[in-house]
Swiss-Prot record:
It catalyses: (S)-2,3,4,5-tetrahydrodipicolinate + NAD(+) + H2O = (2S,4S)-4-hydroxy-2,3,4,5-tetrahydrodipicolinate + NADH + H(+); (S)-2,3,4,5-tetrahydrodipicolinate + NADP(+) + H2O = (2S,4S)-4-hydroxy-2,3,4,5-tetrahydrodipicolinate + NADPH + H(+). One of its GO terms (biological process) is lysine biosynthetic process via diaminopimelate. Pathway: Amino-acid biosynthesis; L-lysine biosynthesis via DAP pathway; (S)-tetrahydrodipicolinate from L-aspartate: step 4/4. Catalyzes the conversion of 4-hydroxy-tetrahydrodipicolinate (HTPA) to tetrahydrodipicolinate. Belongs to the DapB family. Keywords: Amino-acid biosynthesis, Cytoplasm, Diaminopimelate biosynthesis, Lysine biosynthesis, NAD, NADP, Oxidoreductase. This is 4-hydroxy-tetrahydrodipicolinate reductase. It comes from Rhodopseudomonas palustris (strain TIE-1). The active site is at 157 (proton donor/acceptor), 161 (proton donor). GO terms for molecular function: 4-hydroxy-tetrahydrodipicolinate reductase; NAD binding; NADP binding; oxidoreductase activity, acting on CH or CH2 groups, NAD or NADP as acceptor. It is found in: Cytoplasm. One of its GO terms (cellular component) is cytosol.
Amino acid sequence: MSEMRLIVAGAGGRMGRALTRAISETEGVVLTGALESPNSELLGKDAGTLAGLPANGVLLSADLWSLSANADGIVDFTVPQATIANVAIAAQRGIAHIIGTTGLSTSDNAVIQSVTDRAVVVKSGNMSLGVNLLAAIAKRVAQSLDDSFDIEIVEMHHRAKVDAPSGTALLLGEAVAAGRKIDLATHSARGRDGFTGARKPGDIGFASLRGGTVTGDHTVIFAGASERIELTHKAEDRMIFAHGALTAARWAKGKKPGLYSMADVLGLGDI
């Protein structure tokens, strides 16, 4: 099989640089384009140099249409506004779109869904193997325990993270909600403060912590009478997300149009 030619969106950011490094370490993929916002001071810089590698001749550009002319896919860990702009071009070009952007709204997700009749999209709040295994396990635990066990999800990230709860926390919330056969949107408790009253039965609670340089810690708590189950994942290096995204990109090549998740990529649907 020929190499998969990939564009990295947000190539000047932390995840973008991690993706550039991951591509350089991974067989079967090659960096063919580096996308940045039109007002970035990094436009024209070499993507390899920015990632701490030897220069690779791939210069940062704001023109996705031109970059995508000779690409097979785009890996996108940016911000919602940028991702939604990229969705239309990726679909028009017929290239796979791997989306790790978090903080997407209901309307953003509707835009993404609207192109999946003609485009391959893999979207996940977390691309790591460990977190997706955690989600599958948490779903199974939620199926096995009755609602006398309260569910709380606690996450912590670095001080610069701008959205809360994290995309990973929401991914875990969706997993346990599916296990309970309830709708997360109507059973989500966030931002408790002051005199809130007793906990509503059946709610899934979220707590978000921010500080330091924490890459990402997530714990799903099942709290029952006199006993508690805690399932935890701690990310120590964002390269796990980069390598997971490349696994998704290679998996997506040649797939039929549709919206896929990392559970599809990793074959976790039956766990």
